[in-house]
C-alpha cells in the first residue's frame, strides 16, 4: 500500500511540475505544443463561463 501511495504522490508532483513549467514558459495554458523530433503533441482547452 505504501508503494501505491508513493506512486500517486510522484504522479501528482510530476503533473504539478509540468503545469508550473508551462505557466513559466507561456502566458496561459489554453494552448500548449510540445515537439520532439517528428512528434508533436498539442493540447487545447476551451471553456465557457456562465
Swiss-Prot record:
PROSITE patterns documented for this protein: HOK_GEF
Effect after changing residue 30 to S: Prevents dimer formation
Subcellular location: Cell inner membrane
Superkingdom to which the source organism belongs: Bacteria
GO cellular component: periplasmic space; plasma membrane
Main location, first listed in the record: membrane
Transmembrane segments: 6-24
Function recorded in the entry: Toxic component of a type I toxin-antitoxin (TA) system. When overexpressed kills cells within minutes; causes collapse of the transmembrane potential and arrest of respiration. Its toxic effect is probably neutralized by antisense antitoxin RNA SokC.
Protein name, entry field: Toxic protein HokC
Species this chain originates from: Escherichia coli (strain K12)
Keyword line: Cell inner membrane, Cell membrane, Disulfide bond, Membrane, Signal-anchor, Toxin-antitoxin system, Transmembrane, Transmembrane helix
Miscellaneous comment text of the record: Interrupted by an IS186 element, which silences the locus in strain K12 MG1655.
Keyword Cell inner membrane: yes
Domain comment in the entry: The periplasmic portion confers toxicity; dimerization is not required for toxicity.
Membrane topology: Single-pass type II membrane protein
Residue ranges, Cytoplasmic side: 1-5
The protein's assembly and partners: Homodimer; disulfide-linked.
Family (UniProt): Belongs to the Hok/Gef family.
Pfam families: HOK_GEF
Periplasmic compartment segments: 25-50
Amino acid at each position: 500500500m505504501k508503494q501505491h501511495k508513493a506512486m500517486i504522490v510522484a504522479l501528482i508532483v510530476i503533473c504539478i511540475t509540468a503545469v508550473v513549467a508551462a505557466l513559466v514558459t507561456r502566458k496561459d495554458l489554453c494552448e500548449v505544443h510540445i515537439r520532439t523530433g517528428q512528434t508533436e503533441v498539442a493540447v487545447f482547452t476551451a471553456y465557457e463561463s456562465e
